[in-house]
Regions:
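N-terminal secretory signal peptides
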Residues: 1-13
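C-terminal segment of N-terminal export signals and the immediately downstream linker at the start
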Residues: 11-16, 30-71
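Short alpha-helical segments used as structural interaction elements across diverse proteins
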Residues: 12-13, 17, 133, 188
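Short, well-ordered alpha-helical packing segments
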Residues: 16-26, 73, 117, 140, ...
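N-terminal export signals
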Residues: 2-3, 17-40, 132
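Long, amphipathic alpha-helical surface segments
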Residues: 158-238
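Flexible, low-complexity segments enriched for small/polar residues
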Residues: 48-55, 68-69, 73-187, 197
Length: 238
């Protein structure tokens, strides 16, 4: 007698499906934050590819874009006397793999990297990755300062909203104080994802003295751990 057909067919998602779902969640969740287990799944995918192929081959970015992303990651979370940089922790691979599975995220990064090159060429006649370190830092500093000023202006607008002086000015709003808006948007995403990649990696977990447990699928890295990781970044204070 043959076994009865099960009433419910359970489909186990493939690794590719899981990765795609994780990538799509990045732009679907407010703040773009990933659960620890999801982030470590991405790191594991990269680790397995390196073990099989000997190296990681970018899935989305071309050679120049990937080099730029790598440079940015080590600027955002540089190496110190305790541990390596975000580049050493696998942030470029982490971001590339997620972007390859999410068209919206891919657009943010390819557009943002192109914007950085265009802006740097105005300042130094070279692409971002070819520019001097002080020029790279200066451009990123300007993005952080613009973001801070824009937030302050927005808060000031909320304070005056509804007052007699504000009535009739609502359609004007509070605009960015410069034309760096696209860069600010991109760099905000990049900082968040670089720090996410860092503190969920083996290097990052050791650095912040947090011992992850993959069983706790709903666990989110504590705010204090994020703040600790951000302290490593010269571009986090705004």
């Amino acid at each position: 007698m043959s076994d009865p057909t099960p009433l419910v067919q359970i489909e186990i998602p493939s690794r590719r499906d899981m990765l795609r779902n994780i990538a799509l969640a990045v732009t679907a969740v407010a703040g773009g934050r990933l659960k620890l287990e999801a982030a470590q799944h991405v790191h594991q995918q990269v680790k397995e590819e390196k073990k099989t192929a000997g190296t990681y081959q970018p899935k989305l970015f071309n050679k120049h874009e990937y080099a730029t992303l790598s440079r940015l990651s080590e600027l955002i979370v540089p190496a110190d006397e305790v541990s390596g940089s975000a580049k050493d922790a696998g942030a470029p691979e982490f971001i590339d793999l997620l972007c390859s599975q999410n068209p919206a995220l891919a657009n943010i990064y390819t557009g943002g990297l192109a914007w950085l090159d265009t802006e740097m060429k105005k300042l130094s006649a070279s692409t971002f990755v070819e520019a001097r370190a002080d020029q790279q830092v200066a451009l990123l500093d300007s993005l952080v300062e613009t973001e801070r000023t824009t937030k302050e202006n927005r808060q000031r607008g909320l304070m005056y909203e509804g007052t007699a002086h504000y009535i009739g000015l609502g359609s004007y709003g509070f605009q960015s104080p410069s034309d760096l808006g696209p860069g600010v948007f991109f760099f905000s995403w990049l900082r968040k994802m670089t720090v996410d990649a860092f503190y969920t990696s083996e290097i990052g977990i050791q650095d912040i003295q947090y011992k992850g447990n993959s069983v706790l699928s709903q666990f989110e890295v504590p705010r204090e751990s994020i703040d600790f990781a951000l302290q490593r970044s010269p571009f986090a204070k705004h």
